Amino acid sequence: NDCILKTLAGQLSNERPLFLKIAYNGPKAMEELSSYDPNNLIVGILGGGKGTTRDCFELISKACKYGAKVALFGRKINLAEDQGLIVKTMRMVVEGMSSLEGVKFYHDQLKRKKIKPDASIEKDKQITENVLKL
């Protein structure tokens, strides 16, 4: 963050990017970047690796909680069992559903659609990415 903020500080306002696309590095880092210039700089997160479904929903929940305004989740969506359903559930998480409730909802909907999940619900309930445990 220090390097990013120093780079931004050294630019004239008309030279600065409007959008930052970054990896989620925990609450403190996200809050720091998103509060730097909230009226002129949009902070967005990358989706990262596949992880579990809970990792996906926890990432979007925490990023939103700590100031991110955009999520760019290519792989997490493309590798999902049901792409439309995962996007719908991500939206529900952004709107207040917990990440654990999101996993339960997602698996329930897969079952209703007779789509076999890639992982059991017990495995998918786990948070496996360390940065999400902060």
Language-model regions: role of each:
Residues 1-43, 54-69:
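Alpha/beta enzyme core
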Residues 7, 52-53, 89, 128:
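Residue-identity detector for threonine
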Residues 45-50, 66-83:
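Glycine-rich phosphate-binding active-site loops on the catalytic face of alpha/beta enzymes
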Residues 64-66, 78-131:
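C-terminal helical cap(s) of enzyme catalytic domains, especially alpha/beta-barrels
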